[in-house]
Amino acid sequence: MAAFKTLDDIGNISGKRVLVRVDLNVPVADGKVTDATRIERIAPTIAELSGKGAKVILLAHFGRPKDGPSPEFSLEPIARATAEVLGRPVGFASDCVGDMAGSAVAAMNKGDVLLFENTRFYKAEEKNDPAFSERLAANGDIFVNDAFSAAHRAHSSTEGLARLLPSFAGRTMQAELEALEKGLGNPVRPVVAIVGGAKVSTKIDLLMNLVKKVDALVIGGGMANTFLAARGTDVGKSLCEHDLAPTAKQIMIEAAEAGCAIILPVDGVVAKEFKAGAACETVAISDVPADGMILDVGEKTVKTIGEWIDRAATLVWNGPLGAFEIEPFDHATVAAAKHAAARTKAGKLVSVAGGGDTVAALNHAGVADDFTYVSTAGGAFLEWMEGKPLPGVDVLKR
């Protein structure tokens, strides 16, 4: 049994008003949605609730409006895109509380789907204001949270509502939580983590948490340079946070105490400038020229990472191994991603990945669909990896 209530526990909802918190923070250009992935992810929950005769009312934020309602942050164009994905009409109410919202709900029939306007048009939303939560709850009988990506925020539409109405995890939220449980909560060992990206400073909490939970930690990207420098390696003109060398040393000490192997690059792809087609060479990590920048890990390191992926039963991945946006500095990330995907498809690996750059890198490698689970949740995924409580999830627990 899941530790949280899901749609399997919801009972008879025919004719009930179900408020569903969803993630509709999708890219929009010229009034049109350019990537509907997040809408596609919530479609099963909406279809299931609607099919059971519920009146489905969608709650979401969009962007970061500063001073109340603003046309550029309206969800109205997204209602149209949601209707296209669902293949059915989706109503739109130009407020999320008050008379306009109430009258739109009153006009609903069983199975109808309605999208409320941006919850962040009210400052009270982000303050988790109890009075605002009650105004939202007035339009619902049941609350379903299907927005894991907003679960790290204690807002009225994520945490406040769940305190006022019977609350359940939607199918997207459920899938995310079950995947994360396999990744770090209760994983099959050995567990290997790959952490890349530019800076150690943004991932200190993440690294400190992981060394206590995984058997091996592969460090790549610009952040590997900070660890190499902490070990006394000259990294030339590579991106490096020299002031964080003591932090990197402390992470390595804690890893040793916890029995977690730290895997750092033994060679690197070096160039004098960061641009497409720049002249580059692979050198041992001890031979980085003074005017060179490490922009990817080298072939020997790729081989080592592959060997660790072969040993792993579970892989957790956040961040690219090199500057994957520009060829040929995408080689290591693509090679490791394809290797992990092949192991996953063969049934030998549980692979969980997340974070914006990571998703982009796996898409670039063409293997995002072959991983066990790829989280699009951004900040919530990172906070989960950091071992921090997620208010929007905790409130759904049985």
From Swiss-Prot:
<keyword id="KW-0808">Transferase</keyword>
<feature type="binding site">
    <location>
        <begin position="23"/>
        <end position="25"/>
    </location>
    <ligand>
        <name>substrate</name>
    </ligand>
</feature>
<dbReference type="GO" id="GO:0006096">
    <property type="term" value="P:glycolytic process"/>
</dbReference>
<dbReference type="InterPro" id="IPR036043">
    <property type="entry name" value="Phosphoglycerate_kinase_sf"/>
</dbReference>
<dbReference type="GO" id="GO:0043531">
    <property type="term" value="F:ADP binding"/>
</dbReference>
<feature type="binding site">
    <location>
        <begin position="355"/>
        <end position="358"/>
    </location>
    <ligand>
        <name>ATP</name>
    </ligand>
</feature>
<comment type="subunit">
    <text>Monomer.</text>
</comment>
<feature type="binding site">
    <location>
        <position position="203"/>
    </location>
    <ligand>
        <name>ATP</name>
    </ligand>
</feature>
<feature type="binding site">
    <location>
        <position position="325"/>
    </location>
    <ligand>
        <name>ATP</name>
    </ligand>
</feature>
<keyword id="KW-0963">Cytoplasm</keyword>
<feature type="binding site">
    <location>
        <position position="38"/>
    </location>
    <ligand>
        <name>substrate</name>
    </ligand>
</feature>
<feature type="binding site">
    <location>
        <begin position="61"/>
        <end position="64"/>
    </location>
    <ligand>
        <name>substrate</name>
    </ligand>
</feature>
<comment type="pathway">
    <text>Carbohydrate degradation; glycolysis; pyruvate from D-glyceraldehyde 3-phosphate: step 2/5.</text>
</comment>
<feature type="binding site">
    <location>
        <position position="153"/>
    </location>
    <ligand>
        <name>substrate</name>
    </ligand>
</feature>
<dbReference type="Pfam" id="PF00162">
    <property type="entry name" value="PGK"/>
</dbReference>
<comment type="similarity">
    <text>Belongs to the phosphoglycerate kinase family.</text>
</comment>
<dbReference type="GO" id="GO:0004618">
    <property type="term" value="F:phosphoglycerate kinase activity"/>
</dbReference>
<keyword id="KW-0547">Nucleotide-binding</keyword>
<dbReference type="InterPro" id="IPR015824">
    <property type="entry name" value="Phosphoglycerate_kinase_N"/>
</dbReference>
<dbReference type="GO" id="GO:0005524">
    <property type="term" value="F:ATP binding"/>
</dbReference>
<keyword id="KW-0324">Glycolysis</keyword>
<dbReference type="GO" id="GO:0006094">
    <property type="term" value="P:gluconeogenesis"/>
</dbReference>
<keyword id="KW-0067">ATP-binding</keyword>
<dbReference type="InterPro" id="IPR015911">
    <property type="entry name" value="Phosphoglycerate_kinase_CS"/>
</dbReference>
<dbReference type="GO" id="GO:0005829">
    <property type="term" value="C:cytosol"/>
</dbReference>
<feature type="binding site">
    <location>
        <position position="120"/>
    </location>
    <ligand>
        <name>substrate</name>
    </ligand>
</feature>
<keyword id="KW-0418">Kinase</keyword>
<protein>
    <recommendedName>
        <fullName>Phosphoglycerate kinase</fullName>
        <ecNumber>2.7.2.3</ecNumber>
    </recommendedName>
</protein>
<dbReference type="InterPro" id="IPR001576">
    <property type="entry name" value="Phosphoglycerate_kinase"/>
</dbReference>
